[in-house]
């Protein structure tokens, strides 16, 4: 792995030199004070270094499904997606995942938590693109006993195969949702995850209907109460959406230390709701992060857009301009996900893994004495991301991702699978 020397880069408001060696930030010092023979020396004047974003809930294989389920109710949308997915194969998922990775790189994401099918091909795509990822084996038996048994065997086979994966990618168990997975399969999946030290990823309390149906079927228990009664919830659980919550639900999620992922654009677009209980979850002890959801529901994977919309909706529905402040927004896409990843990312400091962005502050979006973070979130767009480094390697330099045109051209050949 080659060394990189970033000259005259702004770090926390100071002009510095930064040396990257063996995938880590090895030294940060005053500008002009680091010399290193053989390093790739990059002049960074006019650019700011910040941690790469982590997208904590998405479906990368949906990257070519934008615009196919518009203006219909959530459960109609879900039925349409499931019908389309019957025609997909591993080659489609491979190319769609590469498209998703390309978009994430272009918009500043260096790691993501994915839930989709054909895991081996997703792994191939992610490895080729150079991002970090949590990739899920998705349990979704739809109460079919034969399908349950098939998935158990396949899950165990794929987990064994994953032991040869790069340490950039982590195997995760996904329980699709309580309405699509039988109780016996939920118990099996959570037990398998715990026996093997794996994270559990689940859609939870996404819609009002999910909650009312659960209460009708499970003696008045909410989805959160139901999963808790089964012993599923814990610090190893990543719960996507957690939108329709009672005070008791919030208390349980906080007490169990669950990671709750807010997917604002998907929730808004599918009219799932908007009153995400950020303050309450944070104060209860939950680890709150942000995600985009898949492109079939949110239509892009832009974490800057996600941050801006999340904050503005919080401020509006709470009638509180201080809701979801800037520093906490940044933490929700950097430091908080790092707790789940269990690695030293999310900060620009010596010894940290070199997953970082170089932000070009030369545009009118940053022509202000206001804070860099405020201008980044509320004024700029993702095209301000000039370069992306992940694990000490440039994935994008000066807005160019190697092979980008070829990735799109190859993927285009597979669009007919969803038409």
Spans of features found by a protein language model:
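Alpha-helical scaffold segments that flank or form the walls of functional sites
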Residues: 66-131, 153-165, 412-418
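Histidine/acidic-residue-rich catalytic or RNA/ligand-binding cores of hydrolases
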Residues: 208-221, 249-254, 271-281, 298-315
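Metal-coordinating catalytic core of metallo-dependent amide/deamination hydrolases
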Residues: 122-243
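Active-site microenvironment of metallo-dependent hydrolases
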Residues: 1-16, 20-26, 333-419
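Divalent metal-coordination and catalytic microenvironments
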Residues: 9, 23, 46, 57, ...
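Active-site gating loops and adjacent loop-to-helix segments of metal-dependent hydrolytic enzymes
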Residues: 64-95, 102, 129-144, 149, ...
């Amino acid at each position: 792995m080659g060394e990189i020397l970033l000259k005259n880069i702004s770090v926390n408001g100071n002009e510095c030199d930064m040396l990257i060696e063996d995938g880590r930030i090895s030294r940060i010092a005053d500008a002009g004070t680091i010399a290193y023979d053989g390093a790739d020396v990059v002049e960074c004047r006019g650019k700011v270094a910040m941690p790469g974003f982590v997208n904590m809930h998405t479906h990368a294989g949906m990257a070519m499904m934008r615009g196919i389920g518009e203006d219909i109710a959530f459960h109609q949308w879900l039925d349409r997606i499931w019908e389309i997915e019957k025609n997909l194969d591993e080659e489609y998922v491979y190319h769609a995942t590469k498209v998703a990775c390309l978009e994430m790189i272009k918009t500043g994401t260096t790691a993501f938590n994915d839930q989709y099918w054909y895991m081996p091909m997703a792994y191939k795509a992610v490895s080729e693109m150079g991002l970090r990822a949590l990739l899920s084996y998705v349990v979704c038996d739809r109460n079919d006993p034969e399908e349950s048994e098939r998935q158990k065997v396949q899950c165990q086979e794929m987990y064994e195969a994953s032991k040869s994966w790069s340490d950039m990618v982590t195997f995760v168990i996904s329980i699709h949702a309580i309405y699509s997975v039988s109780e016996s399969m939920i118990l099996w999946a959570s037990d398998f995850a715990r026996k093997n030290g794996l994270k559990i990823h689940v859609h939870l309390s996404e819609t009002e209907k999910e909650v009312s149906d659960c209460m009708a079927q499970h003696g008045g228990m909410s989805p959160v109460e139901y999963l808790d009664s089964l012993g599923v919830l814990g610090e190893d659980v990543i719960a996507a959406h957690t939108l329709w919550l009672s005070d008791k639900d919030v208390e349980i999620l906080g007490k169990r230390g669950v990671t709750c992922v807010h997917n604002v654009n998907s929730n808004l677009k599918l009219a799932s709701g908007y009153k995400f209980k950020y303050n309450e979850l944070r104060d209860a002890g939950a680890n709150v992060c942000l995600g985009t959801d898949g492109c079939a529901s949110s239509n892009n994977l832009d974490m800057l857009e996600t941050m801006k919309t999340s904050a503005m909706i919080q401020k509006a529905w709470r009638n509180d301009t201080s809701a979801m402040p800037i520093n906490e927004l940044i933490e929700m896409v950097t430091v908080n996900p790092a707790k789940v990843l269990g690695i030293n990312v999310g900060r620009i400091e010596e010894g940290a893994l070199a997953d970082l962005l170089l932000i070009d502050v030369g545009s009118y979006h940053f022509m202000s004495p206001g804070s860099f973070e405020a201008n980044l979130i509320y004024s700029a767009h993702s095209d301000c991301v000039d370069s992306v480094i992940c694990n000490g390697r440039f994935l994008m330099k000066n807005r160019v991702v190697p092979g980008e045109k070829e990735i799109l051209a190859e993927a285009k050949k597979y669009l007919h699978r969803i038409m």
